[in-house]
Amino acid sequence: MLGWTLMFLVVAIIAGLFGFTGIAGAAAGIAKIIFFLFIVLLVISLLVNAIKGRAPRP
């Protein structure tokens, strides 16, 4: 789950870079939403793994 979250976070960051630099101006709003959504998912995933006491899979 953490791997998927990190992958989608990277995709959101790349989409955000395109949106914020004017390459895809219409996608900037969507990229902002996706970026913050996956930041939240990353934090939740890290907390769940910390509570369970497991190390993330390599």
Curated annotation (Swiss-Prot):
The keyword Transferase does not apply. It is a multi-pass membrane protein. It comes from Shewanella sp. (strain W3-18-1). Its main location: membrane. GO terms for cellular component: plasma membrane. This is UPF0391 membrane protein Sputw3181_2781. Pfam families: DUF1328 (PF07043). The keyword Ion transport does not apply.
